[in-house]
């Protein structure tokens, strides 16, 4: 499960919008919304890309929360 609050905060801290991130991942805004709201899971490749884009060092704190 994704830590939605922390991911949203990290996106904002990087001066990006959810639309910016969706475009970067080459997915629709709705697809990204579903992922960030834990309706669908992020793919491993998306987690890697997001971590690089947002400077996330510890992926577990955002993407693998129980």
Give, region by region, the residue ranges found by the protein language model:
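The alpha-helix within a helix-turn-helix
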Residues: 11, 22, 51
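Generic structural marker for isolated residues within well-ordered, non-membrane alpha-helices
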Residues: 7, 18, 47
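Short, basic-rich loop-to-helix N-cap that marks the start of a DNA-contacting helix
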Residues: 39-49
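Short C-terminal boundary/hinge segments that cap the last helix of small helical domains
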Residues: 55-66
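Short alpha-helical DNA-recognition segment
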Residues: 16-34
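A short, Lys/Arg-rich alpha-helix, primarily the initiator
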Residues: 1-15
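A broad structural signal for alpha-helix termini and local helix breaks/kinks
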Residues: 25, 54-55
């Amino acid at each position: 499960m994704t830590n939605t609050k922390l991911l949203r905060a990290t996106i904002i801290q990087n001066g990006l919008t959810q639309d910016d991130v969706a475009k970067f991942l080459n997915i629709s805004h709705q697809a990204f919304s579903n992922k960030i709201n834990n309706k669908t899971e992020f793919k491993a490749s998306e987690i890697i890309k997001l971590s690089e884009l947002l400077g996330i060092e510890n992926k577990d704190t955002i993407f693998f929360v129980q």
